[in-house]
């Protein structure tokens, strides 16, 4: 099985070296082929220089496309290079590479097409737990997804996700620009693909500063809910 880690990075000079190094160390002890590609999303700091100086595999976008455009670039790369599984893995050091093998199991067993690394399932809590307000917002989004698709997904905003070949093809063709995680869950469930949540450990970000503010959180909630409703009820070609 060939697995590709897609690492979107925008101004991650403080964390990108450690993020890639963690993958390089981890792949020495797994029984599948593990590759990676960093999608440098038009960074204006030293991210590009760090990637080039260390000869890390990367695609350098000439302008900032945002998280959706960067991740879709990674899925197009995975499709073009015929990977069996693509893994979204944040460049800021929040995702724990040690969770990967467990997350991969449902795809290996043909039990899932999309696996979501979740902070909210299982007996062992993730080292990083988000704020009450964000958990409340995630709960609202979860209820809306349940209402529109019939399936409960708890960690609707997790960026730690694994896609099999059929979902890679879907995401390479169509991927939302602004709020990709909740909207793509609806998109995949509408097409009767199997979505599974598995426990995943996550850390506090190791570098940079989160841009989330209370005002942005409220706007995010309104826009995400709108995008979910549009995705749920619009007709699209396969």
Task: Give a label for each model feature.
Residues 2-3, 24-37, 46:
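Short loop->beta transition adjacent to catalytic acidic/histidine clusters or analogous donor-positioning motifs
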Residues 40-48, 93:
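A conserved acidic beta->alpha catalytic loop
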Residues 61, 89-91:
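Catalytic metal- and UDP-sugar-binding loop of GT-A-like glycosyltransferases, i.e.
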Residues 63, 67-80, 85, 97-178, ...:
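Acceptor/aglycone-binding surface of glycosyltransferases and processive sugar-polymer synthases
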């Amino acid at each position: 099985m060939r697995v590709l880690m897609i690492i979107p990075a925008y101004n991650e000079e403080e964390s990108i070296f450690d993020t890639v190094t963690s993958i390089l160390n981890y792949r020495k002890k797994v029984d599948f082929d593990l590759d990676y590609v960093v999608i440098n999303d038009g960074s204006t700091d030293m991210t590009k220089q760090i990637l080039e100086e260390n000869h890390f595999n990367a695609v350098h976008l000439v302008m900032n496309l945002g998280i959706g455009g960067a991740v879709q670039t990674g899925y197009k790369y995975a499709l073009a290079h015929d990977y069996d599984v693509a893994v979204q893995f944040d460049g800021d050091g929040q995702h724990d590479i040690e969770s990967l093998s467990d997350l991969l199991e449902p795809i290996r067993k043909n039990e899932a097409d999309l696996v979501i690394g979740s902070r909210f399932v299982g007996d062992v809590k993730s080292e990083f737990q988000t704020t009450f307000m964000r958990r409340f917002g995630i709960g609202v989004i979860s209820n809306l997804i349940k209402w529109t698709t019939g399936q409960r997904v708890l960690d609707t905003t997790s960026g730690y996700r694994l896609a099999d070949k059929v979902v890679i093809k879907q995401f390479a063709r169509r991927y939302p620009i602004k709020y990709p995680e909740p909207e793509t869950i609806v998109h995949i469930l509408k097409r009767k693909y199997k979505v599974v949540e598995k426990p995943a450990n996550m850390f506090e970000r190791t570098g940079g500063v989160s841009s989330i503010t209370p005002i942005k959180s409220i706007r995010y909630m309104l826009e995400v809910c709108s995008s979910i409703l549009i995705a749920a009820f619009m007709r699209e070609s396969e």
